Regions:
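Long, low-complexity, compositionally biased intrinsically disordered regions
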Residues: 1-239
Length: 239
């Protein structure tokens, strides 16, 4: 059991939020572009992409018993800063001390074989970037994207993290809060997932368009059964 699994006195939600608010005010002086995670309502994620990210994390036994500790933290506004880059997540999380903890998470890029398989199976099924972002695509693509170990979302062995807190747990609640915060970020911009996993999202759309164009060009010289021949035209008009 880690240090922070012990109960050293109850701290109310209001007290936690007040501590986070004070830290936020202090950080804004040196970080004017700070990006806190703000959860409206009880649901941490509301869109298909955000929910899929969280569901993926919760589906693995490695995380199932630990990640829940981060839910209350992210809801209480403890994730003061969260930024997603290519292959990396940077965050500041308000913990029990006055100084926020620094969390760094590395995400492995999606391997080329899996990406090629996904783009191939997406053939003609995603018609626009808007359709992809909104999560409005065929059910079979949902299964493809969320496949464990072979989908778009990272498996535990592809997630590497470090927190500056003294908690000895492999997955502390500060890291867990950040991982849930990513789900909230994907609600706002699902394309961040493609950047995070270094996937060229335009390939999905371009391949669909290219395949459609190729199909149209192949069929361009084929005579349609609905076309009317010259002799039929004469018969039609009684000539």
């Amino acid at each position: 059991m880690s240090y922070y699994d012990y109960d050293y006195g109850h701290v109310s939600v209001a007290q936690k939020k007040e501590k986070a608010r004070k830290s936020m005010a202090k950080l804004k002086k040196t970080m004017p572009n700070i990006e806190p995670v703000v959860i409206d309502g009880t649901a941490i994620a509301k869109t298909w992409w955000g929910k899929a990210w969280n569901k993926n994390l919760e589906s693995y036994a490695d995380y199932r018993n630990r990640i829940g500790r981060g839910r209350s933290y992210v809801r209480e506004g403890a994730v003061l800063h969260l930024k997603l880059d290519s292959g990396a997540i940077h965050a500041l999380v308000q913990g029990s001390t006055a100084t926020p903890y620094r969390v760094e998470i590395g995400i492995d890029p999606l391997d080329e074989k899996t990406w090629q398989q996904i783009t191939s199976l997406c053939n003609r099924r995603i018609e626009s970037l808007e359709q992809l972002v909104s999560g409005k695509f065929p059910k079979e693509l949902e299964s493809l994207f969320t496949a464990r170990q072979e989908g778009l979302f990272p498996a535990p062995q592809e997630i590497h993290f470090h927190c500056s807190c003294p908690d000895s747990a492999r997955l502390c609640k500060h890291v867990a809060a950040v991982l849930y915060g990513v789900g909230a970020r994907l609600d706002q911009n699902p394309l961040l997932l493609f950047s995070l996993r270094e996937m060229p999202v335009d390939q999905l759309i371009k391949k669909t368009i290219a395949d459609k164009m190729e199909s149209m060009l192949k069929n361009a010289d084929k005579k349609s059964p609905r076309a009317i021949g010259d002799d039929q035209v004469f018969d039609l008009f009684g000539v």
